[in-house]
Amino acid sequence: MSKLIYLDNAATTKTAPEVLEAMLPYFTEQYGNPSAIYSFASHNKDVVAEQRERIANALGAKSNEIYFTAGGSESDNWALKATTEAYQNKGKHIITTKIEHHAILHTAAYLEERGFEVTYLDVDEYGKVNPADVEAAIRPDTILISVMYANNEIGTIEPIKEIGEIAHKHGILFHTDAVQAFGQVPINVDECHIDMLSASGHKLNGPKGIGFLYIRKGVKIRSFVHGGAQERKRRAGTENVPGIVGIGTATKRAIATMEERTAKEREMRDYLIKRVMEEIPYTKLNGHPTDRLPNNANFCFRFIEGESMLIRLDMAGICGSSGSACTSGSLDPSHVLLAIGLPHEIAHGSLRLTLNEEITKEDIDYVVDQLKTIVSDLRGMSPLYEDFAKKQNK
């Protein structure tokens, strides 16, 4: 395979050269423990504080509201488990949606086993949550609302500001999983009344194994990892200084390049969508047509199975996915696609292609040409398509 076109940037991204360069000294040269008192280590303490400030500035937050974690899944777990524990005397009801990442859904299920009640809101055909449904679900014992900023599979951007205003009006904590959105769209936690926000380094050309949880000052939240006094005694463990430098540098890069970078991604994404929808029949675009992440395209191709399509694409040097990378081993159709009303047999034929700023028009042309051949070949072997074609010809 000589050609490689990477279109799975929702799963992970390539670490940017400037990010890697910034990280390297903290592995072999400036490797001191930030908690030590000698100057060799205290330099690293200052560096960690500098990255915290960078991230806070990107969100319109304060630096003492940023807590470093091992990634988005940990941040989601911390937000739900530690706040529900802290506020359970006030109530034991949580509101979320049916299209959340499994880091939220599985944590919600865990909390249900421990006596909490969870309302899972429906979404519309585009994957949008209706803020009115959020407000209607609120009960006197509701303590937390968690709605993702943008969906990791279909790219739909949720009405976060409106939901935040509702939560704020009712005095309920509001958490958003912004793993896909951070670095792709502007976010201001004050404007959106966000109390907690999860993000991850490897989704914005940073390293894996590092993320953060924004926690608004005044929010009661229990310690998630017990031990030392790191992260203001809320998450014990020696700080991952190279990773923190990586996510801080990646954040700086993402904010500085956002306008130009996402404009190019959006242009290529729209070109991809136009060609696929015009040239491959019996295809559906999943997600909102306009309120979606600039690099996301998600399709369903009738009469074929997504895994077979991915294998053929891989043989052609194209990396895509049929849903979240966290559930790639599952044979079940995407819970997100089922939530937007697609039947199982159509949801099985899904393909998510997520771009980066390096993707060119020539790359898209190659992908679409390969996709046309692959879909045609797979439909030619499909009994469902054969039956459909016979009925169409009658």
Q: What does each model-identified segment do?
A:
Residues M1-K394:
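Pyridoxal 5′-phosphate
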